[in-house]
């Protein structure tokens, strides 16, 4: 959070307020005592299904196979386009006019699992990464509840991804925010919107770093 202070996520706050147990494993690796303990804790819940969204850990196959119906991932793109860590930002940077949400059955690959459900969202000419994130977040509750209400049917009709159509949304790094003024104006405009709020576009003026908040 602000001031580099740790704060609970909204999900954790709601769970604690309703006396729902919260587990926050730091690893699932078999090579560590913490990882083995986390796997054992997961098994004690005997989960029917797990839902994963923007989770920071790689889930090994042993974890993916623990729930009766496996693990579902809510991914912020229309797979197989923009697999990976930063699909919203990369869609904006590339000038895509549409993106969306995909609910997929997780496997050992990186966003490579079979697709159960997709819903599209148009990208407006003034969308930033922040505004597009919020528009897509509004789609998630309906999407995942729709799938869970008839999970067996959606899993039976799951569609395999076409790997030949896949591309990857690489994780953002801060230096991507520096504006290269030799680029076309359209590319710079997308850079400003696609990197708002983080890492943010910037340039240097008289030796000083200056934030670029918008284009005209």
Which sequence ranges carry the predicted segments?
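One-carbon transfer enzymes
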Residues: 1-197, 208
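Short, solvent-exposed recognition patches
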Residues: 205-216
């Amino acid at each position: 959070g602000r001031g580099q202070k740790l704060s609970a996520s909204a999900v954790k706050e709601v769970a604690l307020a309703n006396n729902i147990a919260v587990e926050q494993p730091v690893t699932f690796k078999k090579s560590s005592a913490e990882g083995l303990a986390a796997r054992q804790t997961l098994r004690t819940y005997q989960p029917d299904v797990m839902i994963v969204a923007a989770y920071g850990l790689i889930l090994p196959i042993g974890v993916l196979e623990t729930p009766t119906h496996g693990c579902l991932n809510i991914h912020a793109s229309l797979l197989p386009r923009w697999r990976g860590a930063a699909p919203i930002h990369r869609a904006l940077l590339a000038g895509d006019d549409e993106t969306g949400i995909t609910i997929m059955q997780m496997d050992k690959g990186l966003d490579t699992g079979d697709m159960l459900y997709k819903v599209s969202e148009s990208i407006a000419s003034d969308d930033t990464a922040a505004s597009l994130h919020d528009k897509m977040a509004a789609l998630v509750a309906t999407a995942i509840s729709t799938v869970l209400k008839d999970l067996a049917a959606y899993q039976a009709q799951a569609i395999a991804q076409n790997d030949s159509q896949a591309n990857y949304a690489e994780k953002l790094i801060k230096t991507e925010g520096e504006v290269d003024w030799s680029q076309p104006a359209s590319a710079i405009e997308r850079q400003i919107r696609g990197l708002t709020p983080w890492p943010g576009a910037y340039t240097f003026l008289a030796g000083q770093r200056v934030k670029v908040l918008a284009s005209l």
